[in-house]
Regions:
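Outer-membrane beta-barrel proteins
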Residues: 29-37, 59-89, 124-137, 174-190, ...
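Membrane-embedded beta-barrel scaffold of Gram-negative outer-membrane proteins
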Residues: 143-171, 309, 315-325, 340-404, ...
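Structural signature of Gram-negative outer-membrane beta-barrels, strongest in the C-terminal barrel
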Residues: 87-91, 101, 195-198, 204, ...
């Protein structure tokens, strides 16, 4: 959890292997607001050395919020994907895999509504120009794993293509004032190779290398209808980078159960931006600006962790890591000094414990953390109020605690409780343009409290027609969330209640579910443009049902 762009950690996604699982899964789900979600997957093994997976899904929604001007939903959505995975194990110590996926998404865009100037609550969505977001995504990956005597070698090769198109009624009003369009194409190739020890013993090691190339072509067009002209900005931004890393772990250090891990990573990145700016009128197109800039970044990010495993399977741990997020070019700016933004770095300190209690019927976990940021990248509005750009805050910090309890108090009942408290503030952040000092204010978009409690109660064989009956409910709470650096507008704490009832017989499961069952009224997002505040409301109460078949 250290290195390039790992400020928020890393999520590993694991899917079923056709060499270990065979079968067909069908998922059908419908709900109100025209919600539909259909999926099909098939896993098959041919012989003992080869297997394949094919899957596809389709999801759509009529939308949740009506645009008063068009009398149509502003956030309708359709998306679909297809995926194939091949696995081949020519020898016991060699595995080869190939995965390819294709995704297409078409969405009505941005159900943002103007907020009341006093209460800051959003009104109704009401703008005249249809807004949209369309994306095509193709990803192909190749993997190879070799198990040698006392070591293993792993290779991951990937290529990704994204075609992105969006249009936004930038004034969000019934008037034709601004309309923004962005067309982006991205290609990325990456390769990661590592070798690690597999022999039993007190010392474990890992060495690795990573490299990538990324090319982004981006065109941003802004139509000024009342002024009878448009601006068009073209960005060609190729980026490449390499990284080398090592990690060592010593087990049973000084005493049994105590281990020490040390890691270090070096990243180098080069990015450039070929920029052209045109003003287009009825008389033609005129070039207003152009530049070709280059940026180079390099960073060493260490990690050290100490862990003690109790004989009872509990553990204590402490970690210190350095996080790193690269700098780059802004696609919107109105001052020369705002064309670029610097890298963001952080030192992350964590102290925690995990332990089973009450004969393993209860698992408890607690973690204290402190993050010390430098040059944190923060979005700010342009002086023209027609877009946002990234700039660096001097210094920020985030500290808090997370507590988790998982229990099985009686047979068939599982209960989970999670709570997190975060105190994230600017330590040194001055906006020279506005002459405002934000030091001491809370960071925007960071909830102060997060809370979740959930329970699942399963009744086996309640009758001869049902093998398993499950009742599930969960409550999640979030807030307060500050929307801006000045802390003048925020979302108070709110809670969402969800529930589901399911019944299983043989290979088929039926379920009925509800989300936001109390109809909580809250804002999911807030921003300001054109001198006014806009927000997107959270989704209302929804209800639906599922049918799942596994055979």
């Amino acid at each position: 959890l250290y290195g390039r762009n790992t400020m928020g950690g890393i999520i590993n996604v694991y899917t079923k292997s056709p060499l270990k699982y065979e079968g067909t899964n069908i998922w059908l789900s419908n709900g109100n607001y025209g919600y539909r979600d259909y999926a099909l997957s098939h896993y098959k093994k041919i012989g003992e050395k080869f297997g394949y997976t094919v899957s596809g899904d389709f999801q759509s929604s009529d939308g949740y919020f009506t645009n008063l001007f068009t009398d149509k939903k502003a956030d309708d959505m359709k998306s679909g994907s297809a995926r194939i995975r091949l696995e081949w194990k020519p020898r016991k110590n060699l595995s080869i895999g190939l995965m390819s996926s294709f995704d297409r998404s078409v969405q009505g865009g941005y159900p943002y509504a103007v907020c009341d100037s006093v209460t800051h609550k959003p009104g109704e969505v009401n703008y005249n120009d249809y807004s949209f977001y369309k994306r095509t995504l193709s990803t192909t990956g190749f993997s190879a794993d070799y198990q040698g005597r006392g070591y293993s070698i792993n290779s991951r090769t990937a290529f990704q293509y994204i075609s992105d198109h969006q249009g936004i009624d930038q004034d969000f009003s019934p008037k034709s004032i601004y309309f923004a369009r962005q067309d982006m194409k991205q290609k990325m190739f990456s390769e990661e190779l590592n070798i690690k020890s597999t022999t039993p013993g007190c010392y474990k090691w890992l060495f690795g290398a990573f490299g990538f190339w990324q090319g982004i072509d981006n065109t941003v067009t802004l139509d000024y209808f009342t002024k009878n002209y448009a601006t068009r900005k073209l960005y060609d931004t190729p980026t490449y980078g390499v990284a080398f890393y090592h990690q060592s772990t010593i087990d049973d250090l000084l005493t049994r159960g105590l281990s020490l891990t040390f890691g270090i990573r070096y990243d180098y990145e080069h990015t450039s931006n070929d920029f052209l700016f045109y003003k287009e009128t009825d008389g033609g197109s005129k070039q207003m600006d152009a530049f070709d800039s280059r940026l180079k970044f390099s960073q060493v990010t260490p990690k050290i962790a100490l862990q003690y495993m109790f004989p009872s399977t509990g553990m204590l741990y402490a970690t210190v890591t350095k996080g790193y997020k690269t700098g780059g070019f802004n696609t919107s700016f109105d001052r020369e000094e705002d064309r670029t933004f610097r890298p963001e770095t952080s030192w992350n300190y964590e102290l925690g414990a995990k332990h089973p209690l009450l004969d393993n019927r209860l698992n408890a976990e607690i973690c204290f953390f402190w993050i010390d940021w430098k040059n944190q990248q923060i979005y700010q509005m342009l002086a023209t109020q027609n877009g946002q750009f990234l700039r660096n805050a001097g210094r920020s910090e985030s500290k808090g605690v997370e507590v988790s309890l998982q229990g099985n108090p009686v047979n068939g009942l599982m209960v989970q409780v999670n709570y997190g408290f975060t105190h994230a503030t600017f330590k040194d952040y001055k906006d020279e343009r506005k002459g405002i000092d934000y030091s001491g204010n809370f960071l925007p978009m960071v909830p102060r409290h997060t809370f979740a409690v959930g329970a699942d109660y399963t009744i086996p064989n309640p009758c001869r027609h049902i093998d398993r009956f499950t009742i599930s409910a969960n409550y999640t709470g979030t807030g307060r969330i500050q929307w801006k650096e000045d802390n003048k507008i925020s979302q108070p704490y709110y809670g969402l209640l969800n529930a589901k009832v399911s019944a299983t017989k043989d290979f088929i499961t039926f379920a009925i579910w509800g989300k936001n069952m109390t109809g909580a009224d809250y804002s999911a997002f807030y921003f300001e443009t054109g001198g006014k505040g806009l927000a997107q409301k959270g989704r209302p109460f929804t209800i639906g049902g599922n049918i799942q078949l596994n055979f």
